[in-house]
Amino acid sequence: MRRQLRLVPFLALVPAMCPTAAGDGPIPPLSPPVLSGAGGVIPDPVEQPSEESAAWSIMGEGGMTADRLVSFLLENNPDADSARVVLLASLYIEEAAAEGVNSDVAFVQMCHETGFLRFGGLVTEEMNNFCGLGSTGPGNPGLRFPDERTGVRAHIQHLKAYGSTDSLNLGQVDPRFGLVSPRGRSPDIFGLAGTWAADRQYGLRLADLLESLYE
């Protein structure tokens, strides 16, 4: 399935190198490089283009199959563990569907935050933290989860906190879910710039990844 999207300005498809807190206060000025975390609360998020495409929406149904998610990640990181990529693709589709989150958005955000599973920053592979939750700088690398499913579920739940005011459908595993204030503050990916991540181009970077996914 292919979506027709409006083009956005090209930005390099690299992991964000700006530390953030996870929904609970201003983002501290720390020295890069570290992977971006999940959502410090900033009073006035930067304005981004307001495309009407549902592809930009955090909530909704993703259009890509697990096979396409797998091929997309491996195209960008041929050295990734293919078995783990297959597992993560299926988990993102399952967990996103359970909460009504757009699985395409969640998956490309994971690719962005982890450098297509290269990691290399404060968050490491064995942490099963696929979105930088709680990663704010040296000495605070972020949250650890016992397995891939729990880590993916925490990511999906944190996205839902930004994209919707609805309650969770599954048991809460994201300890920072209640720290996102106000709930539903970012119905689309552009609202994540300056809130989820310090990077003011964060939403555009995710849009570039979505464009690539849908090619």
Language-model segments: which ranges?
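Catalytic cores of secreted/periplasmic lytic hydrolases that degrade extracellular macromolecules
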Residues: 2, 19-215
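Bacterial N-terminal signal peptides
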Residues: 8-16
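Bacterial N-terminal signal peptides that target proteins for export
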Residues: 1-8
